Structure formats: C-alpha cells, structure tokens
Amino acid sequence: MSLFNVSNGLRTALRPSVASSSRVAAFSTTAAARLATPTSDNVGSSGKPQHLKQFKIYRWNPDKPSEKPRLQSYTLDLNQTGPMVLDALIKIKNEIDPTLTFRRSCREGICGSCAMNIDGVNTLACLCRIDKQNDTKIYPLPHMYIVKDLVPDLTQFYKQYRSIEPFLKSNNTPSEGEHLQSPEERRRLDGLYECILCACCSTSCPSYWWNQDEYLGPAVLMQAYRWMADSRDDFGEERRQKLENTFSLYRCHTIMNCSRTCPKNLNPGKAIAQIKKDMAVGAPKASERPIMASS
C-alpha cells in the first residue's frame, strides 16, 4: 500500500520499505542490558528503569520539495510518556523535535483531528495505546495529498461532505417549539450520528483510493444516510436521486475495510447497503428502518 504526498505538483509514492533518514537516532540493546541492575545511566527521572521504545514517523516538508519523504526515528522512555500514541507525539514535539507536524485537539476521541495510520491501521492517535513491545510506525492517512508530515489535505473530503447537504430539510418545520420525533424514530439514528468525520474509513477504502474525485466514500455516504433516516427530514427521495449515478454510491464493493477500521465502532458499509436497498425497492417509514448501532 502506497502513501502519497505533493512534490512539485506531482504525487510521490512512499512504500513501507523506504530507507530511514541518515539522521535517524540509533537504538539497540542487549539481554545483559535488560537484566542489568539499574544505575544512574539507565534509570529515568521517575526512579524506574528506562523502558526505551522507537517511534518511526513519516516526515515530509513542503518547503523542501527536493527532499523525498522519509521515516524519522525518535526514542522515548515509556515510563516518562502517557499511554497513548498521541501522548508520545506530543512529547516528541514538545521535548525533541518542534518541527514535527500533526493535528490534534480533544484527546478523547471526539474531534477526529488526530486520525492517522498507526502500524498499518487507520485510527485515532488519542485512542490508540502504545505497543510496548515493538517499534511503532506512524504515517498520515493513506492515499491523500499531504500538507506536511502527518497532516493530510482534507479539502476534497469536506467538499464531498458539503455536497450531501448535511442538515435537516423539512417542509413541516413547527412554527414554535421543538421539531419532535418519537423515541423509536430517534433510536434509528444511533450508529449514524456518532460519526466524527475523522476520515479513517474513507482512506481505508480501495474504491475511494482510486475514485475519490467522484466516489463519495464511506464516511460521507453514511452521513448521507443519517439524514435520509431522520424522521424530521422530508427530502430523502431527493437525496437518493443525487446518488443515482455510476460513481457517487455504486463504487462501493462491500470490501468492508471501513467498518473494520472505524475508531467509533460504526458500520458505514451497512448504511451504504441500506441506501442501495432503498433505491432498489423503496424507502421504509422512519420508524421501520433498521437499527445501525451495534448490539
């Protein structure tokens, strides 16, 4: 699987076998060192023996377009680091290399900012625990243009999201008070509204890799279904008609990478399948729609 960035207007592929930078910090150990009695050389400031670990992180600087993307290694003492990968990234940026660039905000799996590929899996760095036994490789979300280091360009992703009109469209909005729905109708939105638009699912989808200019991808399609399934929305038929073309919806081939990688345990593949069914046999009443939330 290749990762892409922008260099002089062209996409440059970085394969996992790419050589590390000559500036990579070397780290090695031996059985004797692991079994040695702690001394001032191998004891951290906490008084515990150091638990050293390497993080190999994708680096690319748009200000130096002639330099190829590379993996740069950083060594941390896990006894001085929080338990999550995002904790390690923040420690590296604060204490070792301030040029390292990545997105982050809430640190609790709500905002979706820190989505990246960690050890081959798209996930949120704030929810991914550090593997204490093996080196960790961190890349940006795959098959996206790269702004810098671990920051993907999500311009096209948000353009597609805007295209589905992600808001209620109703002909019967109450003139006063709330626009109510029954508990059963509300229950049909579980497993849909929790999406945080992190793009982990879309960037894990091979169909989206090759057709992202026209295929909307699992995240956006699940959000499209979220509004179709809402009992307060009166434009479900029009929303489905907008997807009636070769690429927008039907490039989904039920590979299901999207459902496997979702850090919120949602099922975009199931939502996409329901859109296809609605378009084939007609949409059911809101209160009769299948429940998308995992049991």
Curated annotation (Swiss-Prot):
EC class of the enzyme, as a word: oxidoreductase
Keyword Transport: yes
A Pfam family hit: Fer2_3
Limits of the 4Fe-4S ferredoxin-type domain: 185-215
GO cellular component terms given for this protein: mitochondrial inner membrane; mitochondrial membrane; respiratory chain complex II (succinate dehydrogenase)
CDD domains: fer2 (cd00207)
BP-aspect Gene Ontology terms: aerobic respiration; mitochondrial electron transport, succinate to ubiquinone; respiratory electron transport chain; tricarboxylic acid cycle
Binding site for a ubiquinone: W210
PROSITE patterns associated with the record: 2FE2S_FER_1, 2FE2S_FER_2, 4FE4S_FER_1, 4FE4S_FER_2
Entry keywords, A to Z: 2Fe-2S, 3Fe-4S, 4Fe-4S, Electron transport, Iron, Iron-sulfur, Membrane, Metal-binding, Mitochondrion, Mitochondrion inner membrane, Oxidoreductase, Transit peptide, Transport, Tricarboxylic acid cycle
Family from the record: Belongs to the succinate dehydrogenase/fumarate reductase iron-sulfur protein family.
Function: Iron-sulfur protein (IP) subunit of succinate dehydrogenase (SDH) that is involved in complex II of the mitochondrial electron transport chain and is responsible for transferring electrons from succinate to ubiquinone (coenzyme Q).
Name of the protein in question: Succinate dehydrogenase [ubiquinone] iron-sulfur subunit, mitochondrial
